[in-house]
Curated annotation (Swiss-Prot):
GO cellular component: chromosome, centromeric region; inner kinetochore; kinetochore; nucleus
Region (Disordered): 1-70, 102-156, 271-362, 375-412
Biased composition (Low complexity): 384-395
Region span, Flexible stalk domain: 94-381
GO terms classed as biological process: cell division; chromosome organization; chromosome segregation; kinetochore assembly; mitotic cell cycle
Comp. bias (Basic and acidic residues): 19-28, 326-343
Gene that encodes it: Cenpt
Name of the protein in question: Centromere protein T
Organism classification: Eukaryota, Metazoa, Chordata, Craniata, Vertebrata
Subunit and partners: Component of the CENPA-CAD complex, composed of CENPI, CENPK, CENPL, CENPO, CENPP, CENPQ, CENPR and CENPS. The CENPA-CAD complex is probably recruited on centromeres by the CENPA-NAC complex, at least composed of CENPA, CENPC, CENPH, CENPM, CENPN, CENPT and CENPU. Identified in a centromeric complex containing histones H2A, H2B, H3 and H4, and at least CENPA, CENPB, CENPC, CENPT, CENPN, HJURP, SUPT16H, SSRP1 and RSF1. Interacts (via N-terminus) with the NDC80 complex.
Organism in which the protein naturally occurs: Rattus norvegicus
Amino acid sequence: MADLSSPDGDPTIRTLLRHVLDTADSHTPRRRQSTQTNPQRRRSQTPYSKRQGSQRKTSTRKHSHGTGSVGRLARVQGHGHLEEQTPRTLLQNILLTAPESSTVMPNPVVKPAQVPEVARPSRRGSSRGSLELQLPELDPPSTLAPGLKAPGKRKQKLRLSVFQQEVNQQLPLPQEQRGAADGSSLASSFNLSFVPSVQPQTVDRPGLARRRPVRRPVNIGAFLQNLENKSLTSALPGDSHRTPVAALPTDVVFEDTQPFSQPLAGCSLSVHHSLPNPSQTEVEDAERVVGPRTPSTGTRPQSQMSRAGFGASPLPFSEPQPQSPELREAVGSKEAEEPKDLEGSSGDEETSGMPASRELSSSAQDLLLAEEPHQLFEPPPSPGVAAVSSESVPAKLPSRTRTAQPRHHQDPYKAGLSHYVKLFSFHTKMPVEKAALEMVEKCLDEYFQRLCNDLEVFAAHAGRKTVKPKDLELLMRRQGLVTDQVSLHVLVERYLPLEYRQQLIPCAFRGNSVFPAQ
């Protein structure tokens, strides 16, 4: 006890426990009692309790292996049961696991702070189960190579923050940082990176990188050229009096969007011919012939205004070109023939005093649309300006007129025959073949033809143009259907159904609301 009170001594737990072990008795006083009670316990044990005890022994033996300190404890436990441990064995276990530093006088040397490793607690039961002591089991320092893993050691997990930092730096993860990354949650919370991760310029896996969409620049010149080419191809192939769109300014072509619109004040989109326009009275006669049937009558005042106001203005963007004499003669002959035809048709209409028929109006409309599409909507040329090229641009193409097709009217005679054939198939009350129905239709056709001819002959012989019932009765007498014994009324009652007889018999005797008695 003298060295304990000296100030130079190291009063640690280890020294105190060693002093107790040196002075204490090597045998416990309860050892003898426990040995005496063991036979009694063995007698009271059942096979089930023995089986549980053996299972407990095997589990404790498996748990004791793994480290050096645990191996020492296993040697102590191998001599007896857990219930037979003495205070000496407990103190020896404490000596094996207690730290070397003193709790009263700490070491003056300051060591760098290290991250404490997580200890796995192990519970060991006392002799009676009343004492529970939790002792931490520290893993011994591994002296293995850095590439090899220690037996029974958990796989180290990589922190997300460390991974983000390594991705930003584009550096491989060092071994030192991997060991430090597996620290406590408090130490790893300070390693969080609040700076957004910068995407590296070079990607190791190019297959995961998204491709940028290919944006092709729009070529406005090529777009306008395609529009001009389409307008050239959409023009009529046989029309020689139209100008291509490429010869006109773009703003003039885009501004002229209304159908049959009036030309602009600065330029003229019309065609200049070498011959003068027909007189005003001839055009009015042509309008009177066509009337409201032509769809272009509403634009006639515009064409007249364009002839009056803009006829003398030449084309500012086109140069005069010479024209062949054959073309001039052909155009002149066409223009000379049109007023004559229109004047003749209008004269016939005035002399007759009746509105023009449908055939005359349709023929005049076709004539105007076929031979004068450019004169109805274009101003006349100035006398001092030469004609332009044969191709020119109209203000708007006229709408295509639809020719009225004759309706297919069904012959009422054929419709009546088909009706009687249906009646025949209905009254037979059995299926009839198609060939038999065709034969019935032929017989009905022949019968009705002869009946009509006979009735017409009887009515003409009597000097009448209307067939009367007495003509039918006379014909039926000639055929032998009506005699002096069998009158027409008896024949009706014999062969006609009841619903028809209810309508015909009152009409024959005293009349009804539809056919009153004469």
